[in-house]
């Protein structure tokens, strides 16, 4: 599958995640999305705080801020994160949730072995 095809599927799945969160009356706001390689380095290059192999650099990851009943949820162990993460993982075989590696607000697709 070409990268652009995978990016399109990823974007559609992000839409489904947002709708699922809304159906649970969870609020989401944008966090990190695309990390421009001119700033953060190409894949395999570490130029800032980001991982050298971050799939944010190839438009296959997005971070969100979560609100439950208007309260910002910073605790990655909150049950709402788990509910969103498990739903995300069911949307596609490449869907990876950052809660499995201590980054609960991170939703991505694995690509080239990176997540």
PLM feature spans:
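Catalytic cores and adjacent binding grooves of peptidoglycan-active enzymes
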Residues: 50-115
């Amino acid at each position: 599958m070409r990268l652009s095809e995978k990016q399109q599927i990823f974007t559609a799945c992000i839409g489904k995640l947002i709708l699922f969160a809304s159906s649970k009356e969870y609020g989401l706001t944008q966090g990190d999305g695309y990390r421009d390689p001119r700033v953060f380095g190409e894949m395999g290059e570490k130029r800032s705080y980001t991982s050298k192999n971050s799939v944010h650099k190839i438009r296959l990851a997005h971070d969100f801020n979560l609100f439950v009943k208007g309260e910002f949820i910073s605790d990655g162990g909150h049950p709402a994160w788990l509910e969103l993460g498990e739903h995300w993982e069911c949307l596609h075989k490449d869907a990876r949730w950052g809660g499995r590696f201590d980054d609960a607000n991170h939703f991505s697709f694995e690509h080239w072995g990176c997540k």
